[in-house]
Amino acid sequence: MILSRRMIGSLAMTWLPFADAASETLPLRQLLRLSLFQVSVGMAQVLLLGTLNRVMILELGVPALVVAAMISIPVLVAPFRAILGHRSDTYRSALGWKRVPYLWFGSLWQMGGLALMPFSLILLSGDQTMGPAWAGEAFAGVAFLMAGVGMHMTQTAGLALAADRATEETRPQVVALLYVMFLIGMGISAVIVGWLLRDFDQITLIRVVQGCGAMTLVLNVIALWKQEVMRPMTKAEREAPRQSFREAWGLLAAETGALRLLATVMVGTLAFSMQDVLLEPYGGQVLGLKVGQTTWLTAGWAFGALVGFIWSARRLSQGAVAHRVAARGLLVGIVAFTAVLFSPLFGSKVLFFASAMGIGLGSGMFGIATLTVAMMVVVRGASGIALGAWGAAQATAAGLAVFIGGATRDLVAHAAAAGYLGSLHSPALGYTVVYVTEIGLLFITLAVLGPLVRPGSLFPKKPEAGEARIGLAEFPT
């Protein structure tokens, strides 16, 4: 049998990963192009939370407290994602666009923040010949604020646009693809930026960070080009009263179980994320792992999360109830954190590595299941406020978790060193308090999640067998 070029092309498109995410309203080519905005957000995420963190502390000699304050600025902006989503839902223009203007201005904010950032960091390091002494802190704060606002605005509007164009059947697969593109953006950016900054100097820092800002604008323009249909509006339509944020939030809160779902996501994210900055130090300080060995902990966590993603997607495709899958993820997390506490007692490095994988497995199961439910919350056909509220809850909880986890460990360690805790002065004490707290939060999350399984709550029924596919209901920021 001779295959024509058209048949071969159609087969190739069918065999592509996430080919089932395409639909008549959002073809695969347009979906792949739209997903480029996630690459730019992933790139900014790597810069703000990873590369520039190291550069400020090691190469520029900025105090760690100042670095922590700067990095926390994008997290402080996260709660406003719900407002940004609502504004994009109710935005009116002569062209009829709702999402594209927010994508565009979010791109400008993000690019502007990255353009200003290298100069402000150089000032922050003390390399200043004129001007007020506080100029470095002020300009660095403005740069991080601009980049943070741009990231949140771009991501919220982009996800809402994808949700608008996708069908009910393909929406989870669409958001799953966007999540994968976010990870790809982070991975590629980390490798390229790290390679470019291997021989560090101030000129190289300026070129790399501003180059990322320029790439942000290029990627996002390609992503948003001809993605939203123009629906011209008359002057009377544009001047008609708009729904207020309070009214929209009231409608969202009126959805059965919506606020409980957000509370579940916040507490669960807090429980799983407090250990993010402590896992590797715990392995090194308590179990005596070398630097090369501790890096495998993060790899094990990521592998566990991937297994949790695949297993949960398979269970959902077989008709499992999403809330019960989430509960199983919480139980796995409880067992994993308990194993972390027992690993130094047995002196078992193998148990500790298995615990790291278990934490990833539990968080993956919990995240996929709850996010599958979140995408179904649509208020009067507007998905922006729901997506914004979801992103605000998740991002805020993750940021608070990192701060609370690190602060708790340091406070307990200092109290023990000062003798306030009597004979309790083990190096593992501060970490133990954090892990026990996380176990308690996981039990609280189970209690909050329980009523959602009842009939009448969000997504109480089982999907038909074979109906669910591998996909995310929302993007975990």
Curated annotation (Swiss-Prot):
Chain segments annotated as transmembrane: 31-51, 60-80, 103-123, 130-150, 177-197, 205-225, 248-268, 291-311, 334-354, 359-379, 384-404, 433-453
Keyword annotations of the record: Cell membrane, Membrane, Photosynthesis, Transmembrane, Transmembrane helix
GO biological process: photosynthesis
One term under GO cellular component: plasma membrane
InterPro entries: MFS_trans_sf, PucC, PucC-rel
Gene3D superfamilies for this protein: MFS general substrate transporter like domains (1.20.1250.20)
Top-level division of the source organism's lineage: Bacteria
Membrane topology label: Multi-pass membrane protein
Localization (cell): Cell membrane
Similarity field: Belongs to the PucC family.
Alphabetized PANTHER family for the sequence: 44.5 KD BACTERIOCHLOROPHYLL SYNTHASE SUBUNIT (PTHR23538:SF1)
Stated name of the protein: Uncharacterized protein in puhA-bchM intergenic region
Organism per entry: Rhodobacter capsulatus
